Amino acid sequence: MARARSALELDLDPDVTIGLGLPMEHDDVNGFFPGTSTTLSQTGSNIRNLLLTNRGERVGQPTFGADLLLTLFEPMSDELIIRVEEKISESMADWMPHVTVNKLVVEPDESEINQMNIELEFSLTMNPEVHDAITLSFLTGT
């Protein structure tokens, strides 16, 4: 019987696809379903999926999600930014315990008054010296 390979071993094999990447965009190589070949890149897609999902949207997992989209019609304020940071931190702790959030920045956009930018830098607990980051932007209410 073949021995199961660790996540780090799979990360070193460029021929192994670990999961689906987000966003799903059509290209000539992958079609609509781009694959990810490292645990770190798959985790970035999983974080994006978590943050863009409202609780109750996922069948069988009613608490999955961060409810960030529910803040879209609220006016930009310091309280809103704090609430978004809390929602992200809580969701990450609940659903991604294998991820360490190294930096979380939620701030209004400098040029668009109703846009909120989110930058989340993360690493995996199995390999904490390797980092990646995702960014999201939301237009909020006026």
Identify the role of each PLM range.
Residues 1-86, 90, 102, 107-142:
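Immediate N-terminus of the mature polypeptide
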